Amino acid sequence: MSRRHKAEKREINPDPKFGDLVVTKFMNAIMLDGKKSVAENIVYGAFDVVQGKAKQEPLTVFHSALENIAPHVEVRSRRVGGATYQVPVDVRPERRQALAIRWLIAAARKRNETTMVDRLSGELLDASNNRGSAVKKREDTHKMADANRAFSHYRW
């Protein structure tokens, strides 16, 4: 553990179109090489496609997708007397959100549509309907935690 003081959380401003902090975090995670305007175009473009296909408010689809992806428990490695156990632990709310965003973007990047807008909109729609590889990742994480429930008394 570091003896220095904790790093301060940076203030982030809500996005200009929806006024939502989570959308800003999502944009920042999509952004590559500091190109925020490109990330904005991708996210807003995907939201437009979602609105066209789902006939729903894109923000509600986005939040339901994140909620369906976010894990409740995960496993952490804990070394006890020469053996390493995978110990299931509850996930803090900030980490839940961060993991959901990360997994959603990773799943979208792996898809095989032509543009990132199409990939992201497809993954958002799938995740909001409890399908897609990001939701599968959460299910696998929950299965791992369930399989290792016997080691839950090693929590710290």
Swiss-Prot record:
Q: Which SUPFAM superfamilies match?
A: Ribosomal protein S7
Report the Pfam families cross-referenced here.
Ribosomal_S7
Q: Which UniProt keywords apply?
A: Ribonucleoprotein, Ribosomal protein, RNA-binding, rRNA-binding, tRNA-binding
- One GO-annotated biological process of the protein: translation
GO cellular component terms, alphabetically, are:
small ribosomal subunit
Q: Which GO terms describe its molecular function?
A: rRNA binding; structural constituent of ribosome; tRNA binding
Q: What does this protein do?
A: One of the primary rRNA binding proteins, it binds directly to 16S rRNA where it nucleates assembly of the head domain of the 30S subunit. Is located at the subunit interface close to the decoding center, probably blocks exit of the E-site tRNA.
Subunit-structure text: Part of the 30S ribosomal subunit. Contacts proteins S9 and S11.
Give the PANTHER family listed for this entry: RIBOSOMAL PROTEIN S7
Q: What's this protein's name?
A: Small ribosomal subunit protein uS7
**Species:** Rhizobium johnstonii (strain DSM 114642 / LMG 32736 / 3841) (Rhizobium leguminosarum bv. viciae)
Recite the lineage of the species: Bacteria, Pseudomonadati, Pseudomonadota, Alphaproteobacteria, Hyphomicrobiales
Q: Which gene codes for it?
A: rpsG
